[in-house]
Amino acid sequence: MNKDMWKLSPKNIAALGIGSAVFVIVGRFASIPSGLPNTNFELVYAFLAMIAMIYGPTVGFGVGFIGHVLLDLMMYGQTWWNWNFAAGFLGFFIGLYALRVNIDQGEFSAKEMVIFNVVQVVANAIVWFLLGSVGDMVLNSEPAAKVFAQAGLTTLMDGLTIAVLGTILLKLYAGSRVKKGSLHKD
């Protein structure tokens, strides 16, 4: 377990700031409308998954939350706190799995990819249904049918985005790292 993933070291603070900015940019320019109101196909969640896997739950939460707040303010002039927290907790839950994987040491096996995708699908369902939908019903008096439709589509789209693009990004990242024990002194 990499205990540095829990700390707000200068490296993690930089990752938090840069990651939040990238979240806003990708969220702004790589968002495809789904046809369901206020629900888009968001490529940014593959980036969030990658950041959470590299830097852990603290940075994952921060990038998801801060990035989503800034994106909402930029796009709509207001924010929906329950959905912002949902994005943050998505990064947090994926980051928790990162504590069990040595991706910085070039390890991301097929088994780890499968577990990663199970984790992210479950995390997507939890955050979008519980925090997003239930939050909208409680805080904004939104109709259940509407918010559960949004949560279902969001879970499906974000889960697929992370499964395909997120897994590819993580495999490429792991492949760029020097594997532990691969360098030998001659």
From Swiss-Prot:
Pfam entry (one): ECF-ribofla_trS
GO cellular component labels: plasma membrane
Main location as per UniProt: membrane
Localization: Cell membrane
The keyword Membrane is assigned to this record: yes
Membrane protein topology class: Multi-pass membrane protein
Keywords: Cell membrane, Membrane, Transmembrane, Transmembrane helix
Transmembrane spans: 13-33, 46-66, 79-99, 114-134, 150-170
Keyword Glycoprotein: no
HAMAP family in the cross-refs: UPF0397
Family: Belongs to the UPF0397 family.
UniProt-recorded name of the protein: UPF0397 protein Ldb1710
